[in-house]
Amino acid sequence: METFHTYNYFINVVLPLALPKLYTYAVPIELEQQVQPGVRVEVQFGRQKLYTAIVHSITINPPTEYIPKEILAVINR
């Protein structure tokens, strides 16, 4: 059984891939104060690939097409 969390913020990120859109990730409460546009974060994309992404924007609205994954870490502030 999967556990669902409530998040205050979500971020839209730019991935280092030839993809035509932004992807939205959930921000864990313990990382909220560290996330801002332009900051690099570590995210999982796909089943096992980890990437460094750049935060494009912050929103309170979760995506409607999919359940967002959490960011794994903030790389720089």
Regions picked out by a protein language model, each given a short descriptive name:
Residues 1-77:
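Accessory, non-ATPase domains that flank or precede helicase/AAA+ motor cores in DNA-metabolism machines
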